[in-house]
Regions:
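Alpha-helical transmembrane segments of multi-pass integral membrane proteins
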Residues: 246-349
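Membrane-cytosol interface segments of multi-pass membrane proteins
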Residues: 1-175, 311-357
Length: 357
């Protein structure tokens, strides 16, 4: 399979991953920790039914099982392609490029965008501004920008591993991945957890042509296998959570992640063969502005939830109609707003376009 076809498959995976982020962020009504958070369930009047909310929240849970491992695997596969093409001449230039593309946006958008919007939404309550900034930068508070920090560290480590990559590497990496479930500091646990997926993506690229050719001969069979495995593992993940064993939960989640990524790749590879799919204006827009959409979209959810509470009330937000309305509004508004914010950022600061594209 030629390089252009590889790029098509990976490009479509990137589009799918961005859309999964938007979808998975449109359902939560409760999120946070000791440094701040939102809990619109607690504001609901006594007797309010949470049935529909919990059903929709299970969809979010299932997407979370694989969509961020998918993001990391795509990055690993693309890095393996770059290594094949001899793009990077040394670690210094590589580290500097990753710092500029990942860590500077992480710092800038956390300080100047994420925290101010969370304050506006009431997320931080009585937490002072310095504590709020510190908790987000150190990942002590939940921040969707953890991905930028994690990818930066993972990429630096993978720079030395990918050129020497062998299949047996996955075993110790999986061990590190499991141990991360017991590490309480996100600054350390997240790179430990996601290095496995980055390397798995790089490993997949080494065998991709052979595997893809084989998948094509039995496409329906593999689709059935991956779909069945994903459904079973997702249900099992929901079940084992009651035991409170982090390693067991991580193991089952890993199986679901692999099945979800396999299923998504088959879908992307099929779409890559559809003439004109990548040329559609929608797909091009998501591809070009994907990083910015990721950066700008999620904090807007907190603001929309506060507006929803003011207009519908907690009980109204939790009714079936309220849930559907809020999800549609959150998906459309955050997606469109993030897209136009990305374009505005590029127009105002063209020399910093790589921060969001």
């Amino acid at each position: 399979m030629g390089t252009s076809k590889k790029v098509k498959a990976y490009s479509i995976l990137r589009v799918i991953a961005i859309l999964l982020v938007l979808i998975s962020h449109m359902t939560y009504y409760k999120v946070g920790n000791a440094f701040g958070g939102i809990d619109y369930l607690a504001l609901a009047p006594s007797g309010t039914s949470f049935k529909w909310y919990f059903i929709f929240d299970k969809v979010r849970y299932v997407i979370y099982l694989f969509h961020m491992p998918l993001f990391m695997a795509i990055s690993g596969a693309l890095f393996a392609l770059q290594i094949k093409k001899g793009r990077w001449s040394g670690f210094g230039s590589f580290a500097e490029a990753k710092w500029q593309r990942l860590m500077i946006p992480y710092l800038v958008f956390t300080l100047l965008y994420l925290v101010p919007l969370k304050y506006l939404s009431g997320y931080f309550g009585q937490t002072n501004f310095l504590m709020a900034e510190g908790s987000q930068l150190t990942l002590l508070g939940n921040s969707h920008l953890w991905y930028l920090y994690t990818l930066f560290l993972v990429a630096l480590i993978a720079y030395f591993l990918v050129p020497r990559m062998q299949v047996w590497y996955l075993l110790p990496l999986w061990g590190i991945h499991l141990v991360s479930a017991y590490v309480g500091l996100s600054l350390i646990s997240l790179p430990m957890e996601f290095l496995l997926w980055y390397m798995l993506g790089a490993m997949f690229e080494s065998y991709r042509e052979t595997l893809t050719s084989y998948f094509r001969t039995k496409r329906a069979v593999f689709l059935t296998i991956w779909l069945t495995a994903f459904i079973v593992c997702s249900l099992l993940s929901l079940y084992v959570g009651r035991f409170g064993i982090p390693a067991l939960q991580r193991l089952v989640n890993d199986l679901a992640a692999v099945a979800g990524m396999g299923l998504t790749y088959l879908l992307a590879e099929s779409l890559a063969q559809q003439k004109g799919f990548l040329e559609s204006s929608f797909v091009k827009a998501v591809l070009l502005n994907g990083l910015g959409i990721y950066i700008f979209s999620d904090p807007l959810n907190y603001v929309l939830l506060r507006l929803g509470q003011a207009l519908l009330g907690p009980a109204g937000m939790l009714s079936l109609g309220g849930l559907v309305l809020m999800m549609i509004l959150r998906l459309v508004i955050t997606g469109l707003a993030a897209y136009y914010l990305t374009r505005l950022f590029v127009r105002l600061w063209p020399n910093r376009a790589s921060w969001v594209r």
